[in-house]
Each structure stands twice: as C-alpha cells, then as structure tokens.
Amino acid sequence: MKTTILILLILGLGINAKSLEERKSEEEKAFKLLGRIIHHVGNFVYGFSHVFGDDQQDNGKFYGHYAEDNGKHWYDTGDQ
C-alpha cells in the first residue's frame, strides 16, 4: 500500500513538473514578444526624434541646416 501511494505521488509530481515546463515556455514566448514590441517602439521613437531634430544627448541643440549652409551642423535652439 505504501509503495502504491509512493508511486502515485512520484507520477503526480512528474506530471506537475511537465506542466510547469510547458507554462514556462509559454511565458518565455510572451516575454520575447513583449521584448520585440518594446524594441520596435523604441526604434520608432528614436527615428521620430531624429526626423524632427531632437537630439537625445543634448536637448539644448537642434540638428539641422540653414539655407546658406552646405552641411548639417549643431545650432543652439535660440538661433532658429
């Protein structure tokens, strides 16, 4: 009787361990998807900020060019 209970207990723990592994893999897939979404949103924000001249390193500067310039330079935001 004790042996039967022990065997059933071991089998039950094995089934629970398998379901935990399956849940873990589903969670990993969800976290990977969430990571990809965050990465793409970050890329969008980065590109959006550069299109409109915002600099992440120095918020007091504007990256652009005036008509008389033949290249892009850093200007103070007061010069615009």
UniProtKB/Swiss-Prot annotation:
Keywords: Amidation, Antibiotic, Antimicrobial, Secreted, Signal
A Pfam family this chain is assigned to: Clavanin
Tissue specificity note: Hemocytes and pharyngeal tissues.
Localisation per UniProt entry: Secreted
InterPro entries: Clavanin
Phenylalanine amide modified-residue sites: 52
Keyword Signal: yes
GO CC annotations on file: extracellular region
Example GO BP: defense response to bacterium
Positions of the pro-segment in this chain: 20-29, 54-80
Cleavable signal peptide: 1-19
Function: Has antimicrobial activity against E.coli, L.monocytogenes and C.albicans.
Protein name from the UniProt record: Clavanin-D
Organism name: Styela clava (Sea squirt)
Taxonomic lineage: Eukaryota, Metazoa, Chordata, Tunicata, Ascidiacea
